[in-house]
Amino acid sequence: MEPSKTFMRNLPITPGYSGFVPFLSCQGMSKEDDMNHCVKTFQEKTQRYKEQLRELCCAVATAPKLKPVNSEETVLQALHQYNLQYHPLILECKYVKKPLQEPPIPGWAGYLPRAKVTEFGCGTRYTVMAKNCYKDFLEITERAKKAHLKPYEEIYGVSSTKTSAPSPKVLQHEELLPKYPDFSIPDGSCPALGRPLREDPKTPLTCGCAQRPSIPCSGKMYLEPLSSAKYAEG
C-alpha cells in the first residue's frame, strides 16, 4: 500500500477547501486566487530555506579545520571554573546577605530599622525611605564601633590589679583564734608538749622474754602481778 500524498503539494487548491492556509490571514479576503498565491509564496520560502541550509552544511564540511589554541582539558577546566564563579544559583547562595545600603526588593514588608522613629518616610517613596533608613542605621552602627569604650575600672572606679585589704573586724577575729599545730606536716612538733607530734608519750611495753631467755617467746605480753606488800599498802 502506497503512502498518501501530501495535501496541497501541487496547485491549484482543491475547490471548497476551508482549512489552514499559510499567510492567508494577512490577506484582505479569502478568495481562491489569494489562497493559491499564499501557498505558492510559502512553498518558495520553504525551498529557499532548504537550499540555504544545504549550502551551509556544505560550507562547514569543506572548511579547513582550525588549529586548537588550548587543549580540551584546559577548556573544560576554564568552563567549570566559570560555572562555579558565575552560575546564577551559586551566586544566590553565596551572596545571600546584602549590604545595608541596598534597599529591599519591591513588595517586601519586613522590619525596617529607623523607619518608625524618624521622618525619612515623609513625602518619599518606599524605596527612598528604605535606603535612607538603612543608611542612617549603618552610620549609627559605625559610630558606635568607633566610640571609645570605657573599661569597667574607669566607669566604677574599681582597680582590678590591687587586692582589697581585709576589714579590721576580720583581723580582730583572726587574732582571737588559737594557733593549732599543723598535723599535716610529718616532722612537725607541738610547741606546748615539746616533743614530736607522732611520738607516743607512753613507754612501750616489752615482753618478758628478753629477761627470761630460757622460756620461749610466744609473742604475748602479760602484766606483772602486784606484790603482796604493795597490795596491802594499797
Swiss-Prot record:
Compartments (UniProt record): Cytoplasm, Cytoskeleton, Flagellum axoneme; Cytoplasm; Nucleus
InterPro entries named among the record's database cross-references: SPMIP5, SPMIP5_dom
Cellular component terms per the entry's GO annotation: cytoplasm; cytoskeleton; motile cilium; nucleus
Tissue expression pattern: Expressed in testis (at protein level). Strongly expressed in peritubular cells and Leydig cells and weakly expressed in the cytoplasm of spermatocytes.
Domain of life assignment: Eukaryota
Entry keywords, A to Z: Cell projection, Cilium, Cytoplasm, Cytoskeleton, Flagellum, Nucleus
Assembly information from the UniProt record: Microtubule inner protein component of sperm flagellar doublet microtubules.
PANTHER family named among the record's database cross-references: CHROMOSOME 10 OPEN READING FRAME 82, HYPOTHETICAL PROTEIN LOC681006
Main function: Microtubule inner protein (MIP) part of the dynein-decorated doublet microtubules (DMTs) in flagellum axoneme. May serve to reinforce and thus stabilize the microtubule structure in the sperm flagella.
Protein name: Sperm-associated microtubule inner protein 5
Classification lineage: Eukaryota, Metazoa, Chordata, Craniata, Vertebrata
